[in-house]
Curated annotation (Swiss-Prot):
Protein family (similarity comment): Belongs to the alpha-casein family.
Modified residues (Phosphoserine): S23, S24, S25, S28, S47, S72, S73, S74, S77, S147, S149, S168
Superkingdom assignment: Eukaryota
A Pfam family assignment: Casein
Molecular function terms from GO: protein homodimerization activity; zymogen binding
Protein name per its UniProtKB record: Alpha-S2-casein
Originating species: Sus scrofa (Pig)
Annotated localization: Secreted
Region listing for Disordered, in residue ranges: 144-163
Biased composition, class Polar residues, residue ranges: 144-158
Residues spanning the signal sequence: 1-15
Length: 235
């Protein structure tokens, strides 16, 4: 009986010790959690004094940066006009000449066409001739007006066109007046043509012949039409 009572007392003592240990551990956990929450609140919610101090420092920094940038830009803007004044003083005469040239080109926009004239077709046999008097302006530096050679060029062009027409008419009349030998050759070629019309031509020769017909007379290159003449003695 005594042994049983002793064991019960020991069991009660051990149970009390375990309960105290568990309660102490729970209290320590609760304390640590409370400390963590307090630290977290302090980090996430800073005080108003800290916020004001940081915002004031940033505002002061921004004001200083803006003042420095404005001062540097004003210094650059002060330096640039001085350089521009120097350049305009040095190149004043050159700019005047450029203005005169620009005014001239505005009045005569077809200067390059008159200077580099294309080849003019004189007759259907592709004979060409260029103008001998190009249109070249002369810029006067003494402030006088620009002098050009427009009037002599126009008169020379009219004379050239008249001479071209006369020459083309003369050559055309010369070509129409054939000699007896040429007439005989033409008759002979007509006979050859009639003879070869009996045969079937290849497709390549047909296309070449059609292309030659479609071409205009002033695009033709002058060639001797009597270079190769076949001799057919018997038909």
């Amino acid at each position: 009986m005594k042994f049983f009572i002793f064991t019960c007392l020991l069991a009660v003592a051990f149970a009390k010790h375990e309960m105290e240990h568990v309660s102490s551990s729970e209290e320590s956990i609760n304390i640590s959690q409370e400390k963590y929450k307090q630290e977290k609140n302090v980090i996430n919610h800073p005080s108003k004094e800290d916020i004001c101090a940081t915002s004031c420092e940033e505002a002061v920094r921004n004001i200083k940066e803006v003042g420095y940038a404005s001062s540097s830009s004003s210094e650059e803007s002060v330096d640039i006009p001085a350089e521009n004044v120097k350049v305009t003083v040095e190149d004043k005469h050159y700019l005047k000449q450029l203005e005169k040239i620009s005014q001239f080109y505005q009045k005569f926009p077809q200067y390059l066409q008159a200077l580099y004239q294309a080849q003019i077709v004189m007759n259907p046999w592709d004979q060409t001739k260029t103008s001998a008097y190009p249109f070249i302006p002369t810029v006067i530096q003494s402030g006088e007006e620009l002098s050009t050679s427009e009037e002599p060029v126009s008169s020379s062009q009219e004379e050239n066109t008249k001479t071209v027409d006369m020459e083309s008419m003369e050559e055309f009349t010369k070509k129409t007046e054939l000699t007896e030998e040429e007439k005989n050759r033409i008759k002979f070629l007509n006979k050859i043509k009639q003879y070869y019309q009996k045969f079937t031509w290849p497709q390549y020769i047909k296309t070449v012949h059609q292309k030659q017909k479609a071409m205009k007379p002033w695009n033709h290159i002058k060639t001797n039409s009597y270079q190769i003449i076949p001799n057919l003695r018997y038909f």
